[in-house]
A protein has these predicted regions:
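Surface-exposed extracellular loop regions of Gram-negative outer-membrane beta-barrel proteins
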Residues: 241, 285, 338-345, 389-413, ...
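Short acidic/polar hinge/loop motifs at secondary-structure boundaries
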Residues: 99-128
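Gram-negative outer-membrane beta-barrel transporters
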Residues: 324-326, 373-379, 387-388, 504-505, ...
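Flexible loop and strand-edge segments within Gram-negative outer membrane beta-barrel domains
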Residues: 199-201, 205-207, 211-217, 230-275, ...
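N-terminal periplasmic accessory domains that precede
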Residues: 57-62, 79-82, 94, 110-115, ...
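Periplasmic-side early beta-strands and strand-to-turn transitions of outer-membrane beta-barrels
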Residues: 144, 149-152, 158-162, 172, ...
Length: 695
């Protein structure tokens, strides 16, 4: 299969998929396909996995197939994206071109939870240094997920099309189903999407289970689009409905997550200028507790429920027009968010803690970017100025007893008298360069300066708790009103090489981060006393430290015959503090994924090896445990019975190996065959079957 290097406008790695992972058949076009594609700056060399029957429930798990990317898993549908060792708020994620909103203080509704795999059209990861136009804060990279709402037709005649998908996973007795339908012509497009995922606890082997890994999620979406020769508009609204879902790495489980979204994307061409923009609103209600889906605390006074809510309004407007053998883009964007969370005890009506009280974080940005050719170089360069405004209402606690009440009141008073209103203003810069060295090799380079202001948890967590955006290290944290923004300076260097049947896309990077925010031992005696009463350990405090990260990743492949090929990706990252002799927390170990793929006519077979090295470079401050290396084998296959009907299936972890994923958290659910405090074990053998019908 021939792979051509072709011109592109951004440095991205793209994962394309629709209702069900299926092969791209060599002789026939099919509406279902999965690609993992690595792009370097301006020249694209694909890393295609065709097919890739990936029976994932959590979209974030797809990132393991992108060079440099991975996932921090806190539950069956609570994966937090990681890219080159950074994760959480440092990695920007957009859904349908709009910034995402995480409603809970522990990221139980992580951004990619809102895009079930069976409804996903594409997941795009900017490789290396993200353009300044891509996102407001992209210190750790940028990703864009797009739901599959269909395409406009080619005539005035209306056409009705769609897909019905169903999948069964043996390991958790899980099932996933999805319905996509579109009524369209060349000017109008009406789309409706529905999906449902449900499963029981994950089995490790024939005898053991991981307690608290059950899940149930529904997703609904309706959209309307209109276009003519020069303009396009799409309006959409959707809902996420998650119920009774476990998060064994966290102190509570999900009772429900009700997420509502509405938005619009517009573009129009005026002469040589293209104007585009988006407007979106999201609202999330989220209830979690520590007693309904795991062993309840021995004391009725230790029951806890946390009712969180959040909303955001986001917008962008940009103009793009030809200039100096390229294109100039100028734009502005904003994202205003508010978070509230209240902790209660169902056995004590007097107990109430204002975990967060209208914690505001508003980001406003302006940017300019030019992309074009200078001699043999293709250049993309830009600058962005962001202003982040943060504030919070007063907090407090009631219903506590004795010393605990006194300490909590002291912390609340100190917080309320602190400087809650804070502004951060900073400059981001990005430069990506690319040029061909010869017919087979393209050189890619990048330079960047990126910033990130503190999250609302990092500033406004006034009581020592584990509400940390999903860190899942088992420690209590306290916020810090004196935090500075993080500033990263990064350089990347790589090349794309293709010679006949072989291809490879290596890239190395070095990132120096000043004022990196992480937990350090708290010097607040009141917070430490209260944390020790609650957990037996003193608190960690968010603080600025200095860090560095470096590593390499690549995709590679080799075509053996017309029907047989090898494809894989390799990733390595190292994270260290520069001011102390310590390593950074929860960094993915060296890993490699290699697949042998047979594909002919309507048949596909795949044999995949997944290898992870041991991780002994761990964080002392987080008391992070080392993990051993492991390897598993996966099998996959599919058969297209007709042009409309495809069957697929496979076996994950064929030999039922027992292993620990270093990016999984530590178990906090006593209803499990894994001891409390031990790192969660990876899933055992999983047999899955699936079918998709198109019309």
């Amino acid at each position: 299969m021939k792979r051509d290097i072709r011109r592109s406008t951004t440095a991205v790695a793209t994962l394309l998929l629709t209702a069900l992972p299926m092969p791209l058949l060599a002789d026939h076009a099919t509406p279902e396909e999965i690609h993992v594609t690595g792009e370097q700056s301006t020249n694209k060399l694909p890393l295609e996995i065709e097919p890739a029957n990936i029976p994932v429930v959590d979209t974030s798990a797809l990132l393991k197939r992108v060079p440099g990317a991975n996932v921090n898993s806190n539950g069956p549908i609570t994966g937090i994206a990681q890219y080159r060792g950074l994760y959480g708020d440092r990695v920007s994620i957009h859904i349908d071109h709009a910034p995402t909103l995480t409603g809970g203080p522990n990221a139980m509704d992580a951004p990619l939870t809102y895009t079930p795999p069976l409804l996903l059209k594409s997941l795009k990861v900017d490789r290396g240094i993200a353009p300044v136009s891509a996102a407001q804060e992209s210190l750790g990279g940028h990703m864009t997920a797009t739901l599959d709402r269909g395409e406009f037709g080619s005539s005035d005649e209306f056409e009705f099309s769609g897909a019905l998908s169903s999948r069964f996973n043996d390991n958790s007795d899980g099932s996933s189903s999805a319905l996509k339908s579109t009524l369209t012509n060349q000017h109008h497009k009406l789309s409706a999407l529905y999906s449902h995922d449900e499963g029981n606890e994950t089995r490790i082997d024939s005898d053991d289970e991981i307690g608290g890994t059950q899940y149930r999620r529904g997703r609904y979406d309706i959209s309307y689009g209109w276009q003519n020769e020069s303009s396009r508009i799409e309006i959409y609204t959707g809902e996420l409905d998650t119920r009774d879902t476990g998060t064994p790495s966290l102190p509570m489980d999900i009772n429900y997550i009700d997420g509502d979204t509405v938005g619009t994307n517009v573009s129009t061409t005026i002469g040589e200028m293209v104007l585009s923009g988006h407007l979106s609103y999201n609202h999330v209600d989220h209830l979690m507790d520590n007693f309904s889906q795991r062993t309840a605390p021995a004391s009725l006074m230790s029951y806890r429920a946390n009712n969180a809510s959040a909303h955001n309004t986001a917008w962008s407007l940009q103009a793009r027009w030809p200039m100096a053998n390229g294109f100039l883009t100028v734009g502005s964007d904003g994202n205003e968010t508010v978070h509230t969370a209240t902790i209660t005890n169902p056995n004590n009506a007097m107990f109430e803690v204002a975990n967060f009280n209208d914690a505001e974080r508003d980001t406003y940005g302006i940017f300019t970017e030019w992309e074009g050719d200078i001699g043999e170089w293709h250049v993309q360069t830009g600058a962005r100025i962001n202003r982040v405004k943060m504030d919070s209402e007063s907090v407090g606690a009631s219903g506590m007893m004795g010393m605990m009440a006194m300490n909590a009141n002291m912390l609340a008073t100190a917080f309320n008298n602190g400087d809650l209103d804070e502004d951060f203003t900073y400059l981001d810069l990005a430069l990506n360069l690319s040029r061909p060295l010869n017919e087979t090799t393209t050189l890619n380079m990048g330079l960047g300066r990126k910033n990130r202001a503190p999250s609302y948890q990092e500033r406004y967590l006034w009581l020592p708790l584990a509400a940390t955006g999903g860190l899942a290290d088992g420690r209590n944290y306290i916020g810090n009103l004196d935090l500075d923004e993080e500033t990263a300076h990064e350089i990347t260097l790589g090349f794309d090489w293709q010679n006949g049947a072989a291809w490879v896309t290596p890239q190395v990077f070095y990132r120096r981060i000043d004022d990196y925010i992480q937990g350090v031992p708290s010097t607040n005696a009141t917070a430490n006393m209260l944390s020790t009463m609650m957990s037996g350990q003193a608190a960690l405090m968010f603080d600025n430290v200095d860090a560095k990260m470096y590593g390499a990743d690549m995709g590679y492949g080799y075509t053996l015959t017309e029907t047989l090929r090898l494809e894989g990706n390799l990733s390595y990252v190292r994270g260290k503090r520069r001011d102390e002799s310590d390593d950074l927390y929860r960094v993915a170990p060296l890993n490699n994924r290699l697949a042998l793929i047979y594909e002919q006519h309507a048949v596909m077979l795949s044999l995949e090896s997944v290898l992870y090295a041991k991780q002994n470079k761990v964080s002392d401050f987080n008391a992070e445990e080392k993990t051993s290396g492991y390897g598993i084998i996966n099998l996959a296959g599919s058969y297209r019975l007709t042009r409309q009907l495809t069957f697929s299936g496979g076996v994950e972890n064929l030999f039922d190996n027992r292993y620990q994923d270093h990016l999984a958290g530590y178990n906090r659910n006593a209803d499990s065959d894994i001891a409390v405090g031990d790192r969660l074990t990876g899933p055992g053998r999983n047999i899955y079957l699936a079918a998709t019908l198109h019309w």
